[in-house]
Design a protein with these regions (language model features):
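Core nucleotide-handling region used for phosphoryl-transfer chemistry
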Residues: 1-380
């Protein structure tokens, strides 16, 4: 039985996100990408919305790149609880790499590499890496248009937590574009071996079918790995991250401080924290509620700033006129965001600009108080 929705055209998606402001269709010129800006409790409860984390369509609206669907940590959702899992079902356990997801995007000249957001600086670093490695291009071009090969880019230039000693682009999955089906691990190894493409390693489960014991073993691992992914043969996936990895993201032990809670939310690390709060449901519920309120406030703020930008840009498309004739006449508190958006030339950058601004201004209580107006004066 298929567990993923069939997707061929952007119109297969749009009705499911029409009334969901957390999802955005970004026009990138020769392609469009559908992504989520924030994640609410029910954002991914719909199988179609669960696909909206980097779907890419060409100018005609045809699906051309389908990366991973949204999946969760063990214990993060009711349907990923330990009681709901059965390791006697066919599955493979894979090392969870600590890098950036990379996938190809077909184009007129062949393909570009992209992250969840499309062609980005991180993706261009991966493009430089494969420029003198024709085996990657040959492999990708063989699969292009029907399949999406999914890689992880690990590099000290792009270090998250785990320190990899060399740059590498490692194949983690191959997905059928239209159906969303994930090709089996053994088949991936065989086809990747033909082109000498590195493939993510499997992890031995010495606890057999005892999922609780296995999860605890993974969480007790050291600091040189992020964790594992349990991938069932039907495509269902779950993450288990090591406790050390999560703690190094400053999650569990620091939620007493507002600045740390804000950092967890802004760095999209909440999903790492929640499974470790199972023993403290009141803390878990409180931080989920706060994150939802915070993300809604940021969404509303970005909507306001984007509207201001679009109004001014329509009248004054030249940078100097925009600054002198428009920005000087709006509330000065919006000026830093409007100037940065002008550099990008569109309102799609607003969320990233606001997020980076807040990250730089939450390391002390006084700084948090100075930017609190941005998120509707919420307090942890």
């Amino acid at each position: 039985m298929a567990i993923f929705p069939e997707i061929n055209h952007i119109n297969d998606i749009l009705p499911f996100i029409a009334d969901r402001p957390e999802f955005k269709v970004a026009d990138k010129g020769w392609y469009s990408v559908i992504n989520y800006m924030v994640a609410y409790d029910d954002s991914f409860d719909c199988p179609v919305r669960a696909e909206c984390r980097g779907l890419i369509f060409d100018k005609s609206g045809n699906l051309i790149s389908r990366p991973y669907h949204k999946f969760f940590n063990v214990g993060e959702k009711s349907y990923t609880s330990l009681d709901s899992l059965d390791l006697s079902e066919p599955h493979v356990v894979l090392e969870k790499l600590d890098g950036s997801m990379i996938r190809p995007i077909p184009c007129d000249t062949g393909f570009r590499l992209g992250t969840k957001a499309g062609v980005t600086d991180v993706a261009m670093n991966a493009e430089v890496f494969i420029a003198d490695k024709p085996n990657y291009s040959n492999f990708i071009e063989t699969l292009l248009n029907t399949f999406t090969p999914i890689f992880e880019w690990v590099s000290r230039k792009n270090r998250i937590v785990v320190d990899y000693d060399k740059d590498d682009l490692i194949l983690t999955a191959i997905r059928v574009n239209s159906t969303g089906h994930y090709i089996g691990y053994d088949a991936i190894r065989r086809v990747a071996g033909i082109y000498n493409i590195p493939v993510v390693n499997t992890v031995e489960n010495k606890s057999s079918d005892d999922i609780s014991k296995f999860v605890m073993t993974i969480r007790d691992w050291g600091d040189d790995v992020e964790g594992i992914i349990i991938r069932f043969d039907d495509g269902r996936m779950l993450k288990v991250k090591t406790a050390d990895y999560v703690l190094r993201h400053k999650c569990k032990e620091s939620i007493r401080l507002e600045k740390n809670v804000l950092s967890v939310i802004l760095n999209d690390s909440l999903d790492d924290l929640l499974p470790l709060l199972d023993s403290s449901p009141s803390d878990r519920d409180r931080i989920v509620e706060f994150a939802n309120d915070f993300n809604l406030a940021i969404f509303n703020f970005c909507d306001t700033v984007s509207n201001l930008f679009e109004e001014g840009y329509a009248k004054y498309p030249e940078s100097r006129d925009f600054a002198v004739k428009y920005v000087k006449n709006v509330d000065p508190k919006y000026a830093p965001f409007l100037y940065k958006m002008m550099k990008s030339g569109n309102s799609n950058s607003c969320r990233d600009i606001v997020t980076e601004y807040l990250k730089k201004n939450i390391n002390t209580k006084n700084k948090v108080n100075n930017v609190r107006w941005i998120f509707n004066d919420l307090s942890w």
